[in-house]
């Protein structure tokens, strides 16, 4: 009889533990985040790489992470609706790579309508760092970054590394960014697509820095596509750095309909749009007013002659 009672008690304890570890509204695959504690619990759940598959997260309030024990979300595979809210007070200064509010977004992940404010300065290898996400293989849409980011390689204001399947759409960054290799206002390295995004933050403008390579207003290094993007943040310091560009530092993919209005400085391979183009590149400009006028006049003369 005692064994039966012990067994029943054990089952009761296990049942209670299970209910404690389940996320809010798990039955409907929707998680609501309204407090810093909610967000911290969500991050801990994402330690299991399959937990977030198919879930939708709704952020319903602005959050200030200052003084909290929040650690970056390890991996996310679902949909995160920021709903226009801001997560501020994000700070990270420990050793590591793939650092950001989210460390990794998989190909199925979507993060939209979210602003991140903070200071990100990982130590050690300090690669693939961005205020929103360290490495992105999913979709980041209508997001913004404010604050500062510093590191070594693949350092971006919003995203550290934008992978082959990664897409960054209609995003902005006003973050000050400092790095050594592949440093950009939106993303450090772009292997996917960056579209209709803009940067206003300064990139590597301090004198006391290691000699940087491949630095751009939108991306430091891009082997993917960059379309419809603008930069108005100063890039580089005089006589310091190689492959310094207003949109991209080192480009071997496609740039289309982009513009830069900021000063670009460096030692070698410095350009208003791209610092250096590698072979097999594509650069497409939109039609200029003068070209349109020339085409119209040519057509008119042809008609008059006939």
Where are these regions (language model features)?
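A generic local structural motif
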Residues: 2-4, 18, 44
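Bacterial N-terminal signal peptides
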Residues: 10-19
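Surface-exposed repetitive/solenoidal architectures
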Residues: 25-306
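Bacterial N-terminal signal peptides that target proteins for export
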Residues: 1-11
């Amino acid at each position: 009889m005692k064994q039966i009672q012990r067994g029943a008690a054990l089952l009761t304890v296990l049942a209670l533990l299970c209910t404690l570890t389940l996320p809010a509204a798990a039955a409907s695959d929707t998680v609501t985040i309204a407090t810093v504690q909610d967000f911290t619990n969500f991050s801990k759940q994402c330690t299991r790489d399959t937990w977030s598959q198919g879930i939708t997260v709704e952020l319903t309030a602005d959050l200030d992470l200052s003084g909290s024990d929040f650690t970056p979300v390890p991996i996310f595979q679902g949909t995160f609706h920021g709903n226009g809210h801001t997560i501020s007070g994000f700070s990270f200064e420990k050793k590591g790579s793939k650092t950001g509010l989210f460390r990794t977004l998989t190909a199925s992940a979507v993060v939209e309508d979210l602003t991140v404010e903070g200071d990100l300065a990982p130590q050690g290898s300090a690669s693939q760092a961005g205020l929103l996400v360290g490495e992105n293989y999913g979709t980041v849409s209508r997001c913004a970054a404010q604050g500062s980011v510093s590191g070594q390689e693949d350092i971006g204001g919003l995203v550290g590394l934008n992978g082959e399947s990664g897409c960054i759409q209609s995003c902005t960054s006003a973050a000050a960014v400092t790095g050594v290799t592949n440093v950009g206002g939106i993303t450090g390295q772009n292997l996917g697509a960056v579209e209709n995004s803009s940067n206003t933050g300064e990139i590597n403008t301090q004198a006391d820095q290691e000699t940087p390579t491949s630095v751009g207003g939108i991306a430091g290094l891009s082997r993917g596509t960059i379309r419809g993007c603008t930069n108005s943040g100063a890039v580089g310091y005089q006589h310091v750095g190689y492959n310094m560009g207003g949109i991209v530092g080192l480009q071997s993919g496609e740039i289309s309909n982009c513009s830069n209005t900021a000063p670009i400085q460096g030692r070698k391979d410095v350009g208003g749009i791209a610092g250096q183009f590698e072979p097999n590149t594509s650069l497409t400009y939109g039609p200029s007013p003068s070209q349109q006028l020339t085409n119209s006049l040519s057509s008119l003369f042809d008609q008059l002659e006939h």
